[in-house]
Amino acid sequence: MTQVPVILMPQNTCRATLAFAASCLLASLAICDNAHATLMLPTDALDANLTADVPACHRYDGLQPQGTTSVPISTCETLSPDLGKFRASLTDNGWWIEGGTFLGGTFDLLNHAAHPQLYIGQDPTYRANTYVYITYDLSRIGFAGASQLVFNANVQAFSYAGENPTGFAINSLYISQRFNDGREQVQYGFDELGNQFYGFSLGTNSTTSPAGVGSSIPYEVGFIFNKSAPEINLRLASHDTHFYDRFGVTRSVDPQGPQADWDANNFWGLKWHIPGAGPLYINELGYQLDAQPQQHMMWLRQGVIYNASRFTGFNGGYADGNYAYYMVGDYQLFQTDSTQPYRGFYINAKADYAPPDRNVFAGDIGATFYVLGPFDRPYDVLALGYTYNQLSRSFEHMREASGYTAVDFSRNYALSYVYRLGRGVYLSNQLSYTVNPIPSPKQAPALTWMSSLSLSY
């Protein structure tokens, strides 16, 4: 229910970012002398009730985007894993393709309709998205390491303009190279950096995530979304791959907010520079364990974000830069199926902070209990979450001085369930209660119902 606020930042440049990205790109190309590596294939177990055409899909999954925190659904879980042998032919030539369609709506059950609409669901709110993911194994043409070209594009539509822009966008167009069994990874090109940091999805992939880890702060401080931005990030892991450090540089979102960023970008979403959008730096330290028999899943991470752009201060004047700090953790409390160790009860906890003199959302804490594979349904997800947002009192006082009402906190309670209707078809429902759904003007508590249908193919 919480909206990402509009962020005002004066003009800056990305010259330092672009120089760094260019130097890393040249270094990467310099080591591509006839090297060849095979992408590692996943070893997750098959569901016994899947049809005979499914086993080959594990081979296709080996070409899925590597190293992202927003993992596409397994090819085994699409409507047609083999696509009439089309995927087999693509895989033989180093290609992988997957697509999907998402349809959803949000409705206020307390009938708080308003004109103009002020938040998602206040009036009936609808959204639709169709996307395609394509990868190519670049090690076949001499790139060093396990190398991929990753492309992701979508067409999206929203009935409420305040939720997101409507139109076409390329969300990802980058090269990823992994070395030493994935312990070193470099990625460069165009992407939404939020796909590589923080971990906004709950569950085993982005499709089955019922609610995700919600926080406005990384986007308020400058994470880009909807379209992409030039970026480079480097991930280094320990010998056992459990400890890691990841550093990234990208262009900040446009100073006028997400709609202005969309409008200032070109049709493809691949514009190198947008006036006023300076470089954004992020570093994340983490510890990660996958769910295995006798081993519970654990993912702990903390990160620092710094945006070199100038921000408008709520107390007058400007602030030279902006920053945020986050801590997020997921832990599998216990497993419910030894043959499918990912199934079980989990907890997610998170905390975020940003300085209140230049950010409307100054801090948040939250916890979500979720179950992967409840009720003898291995692909369903159940989640119960709570989030408390501390809002800027400087912003509150500024709005009140202008004659508007404002609040200094919000609370959200959410119950979600993702139901697998069939292979590649998921129905998600969420009931959410929010106290103070927007910072200003003050609104009555909102009780919203969100439903969505996702198709993967």
Question: Which functions belong to the PLM regions below?
Answer:
Residues T38-L41, S74-I97, L109-L110, T135-L149, ...:
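Short loop/turn motifs that connect adjacent beta-strands in outer-membrane beta-barrel proteins
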Residues V132, L173-I175, I232-L234, N283-L285, ...:
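Membrane-embedded beta-strands of outer-membrane beta-barrel proteins
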Residues P445-Y457:
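Outer-membrane beta-barrel "beta-signal"
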Residues D123-D254, N359-G366, G373-M398:
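Outer membrane beta-barrel
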Residues T2, I7, C32-G104:
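N-terminal periplasmic/intermembrane-space "pro-region" immediately following the signal or transit peptide
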Residues D290-E400:
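Detector for outer-membrane/organellar transmembrane beta-barrel domains
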Residues G99-F107, L149-V155, V186-E192, D245-R251, ...:
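Transmembrane beta-barrel strands of outer-membrane/channel proteins
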